[in-house]
Design a protein with these regions (language model features):
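Sec-dependent N-terminal signal peptides
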Residues: 4-13
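N-terminal secretory-pathway/extracellular module detecting exported/lumenal segments
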Residues: 15-124
């Protein structure tokens, strides 16, 4: 019976249970998912999500979260987005109202920013 309770509790856990809060600003919180880190030499890839307290508007639709797969150059302290989507629900849940799977150019990471916090998680 105890095992059944544990299984049911784990199954009921929210989909965002693995997210780790890494940065916070007025009305937003940014989370990284360390379980998604994939390393290839000096480059690490990881999913992260920015969750908005208030509904954000884009033309005629809106969203509560922004989910991104990014690559991090652990040696040169830079990053680039590989895939981004905007979601109707919090924590990257719900319908994606926008998606872009374009690999963007590498950008230097600015110290003491959300980007640096994410880079530290991805690169250890």
């Amino acid at each position: 019976m105890r095992q059944l309770c544990i299984i049911l509790c784990l199954a009921a856990a929210p989909a965002w249970a693995g997210w780790t809060s890494v940065a916070e600003a007025t009305g937003t919180r940014t989370y990284a998912d360390p379980a998604t880190i994939k390393r290839h030499g000096d480059v690490a890839a990881m999913w992260w999500v920015r969750d908005y307290q208030d509904f954000q508007r884009m033309v005629e639709v809106g969203y509560f979260s922004h989910k991104t797969l990014a690559e991090y150059d652990c040696r040169q302290m830079r990053s680039r987005g590989l895939s981004t989507s905007l979601h109707e629900g919090h924590m990257g849940e719900g319908k994606a109202i926008y998606a872009d799977e374009t690999a963007h150019d590498w950008e230097e990471i600015v110290p003491e920013t959300e980007g640096e916090a994410l880079w530290k998680v991805a690169c250890g």
